[in-house]
Regions:
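Alpha-helical transmembrane segments of multi-pass membrane proteins predominantly involved
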Residues: 1-175
Length: 175
């Protein structure tokens, strides 16, 4: 049933249209994977893997929420359609400082998504978790969520594509 709940969360993530629903669905899937990572109760290794996964996931969730709050403070919305509409218009001079909030928020949300897929600079948690988890759980949460989060990441990049000139250095750095 935990696996089915995680599959439901992954299916919901593809259909998310704002950052708050994406956060809730990502956390629902992460909670299922925390349980699956520490599924072997008699193994201290498995318990350690689940705990490391939980602590690093809780930290990165706070970063996601902080980034989302900066985006909301700068744009006044978290809906993807409204965000792309607002980003398509140039900001007036008196609102230019809000662009910095939006840029930092976009970077924080992007870092969170890259952390969730264990991309290169943000992959420090994955070897320990994969090593200590049961093999069946490792196969599940090392492949399936990455595909779904990448599909969400494609949607996210299409929303923030208008800011790409301002943050392309970040993408070059992590690439």
């Amino acid at each position: 049933s935990i696996f089915l709940l995680s599959v439901l969360a992954l299916m919901l993530l593809v259909s998310c249209s704002d950052l708050i629903s994406a956060y809730l669905v990502i956390e629902m899937q992460a909670l299922c994977f925390y349980i699956l990572a520490s599924f072997r109760r008699d193994s201290a290794f498995s318990t350690e893997a689940g705990l490391k996964y939980f602590i690093s996931g809780a930290f990165i969730s706070g970063i996601f929420l902080f980034g989302a709050s900066l985006i909301y403070g700068g744009l006044g919305t978290l809906n993807f359609n409204n965000m792309s509409l607002l980003l398509s218009f140039p900001l007036e001079n008196e609102f230019e400082h809000l662009k910095l909030f939006v840029l930092v928020g976009v970077l924080l949300v992007t870092i969170t998504l890259l952390f969730k897929v264990a991309a290169a600079p943000f992959h420090f948690w994955s070897p320990d978790v994969y090593e200590g988890s049961p093999l069946s759980s490792t196969v599940i949460f090392s492949i399936i969520p990455k595909i779904v989060i990448f599909s969400f990441f494609i949607k996210w990049v299409s929303v923030i594509g208008l800011l790409f000139n301002d943050i392309k250095g970040f993408f070059v750095l992590i690439g």
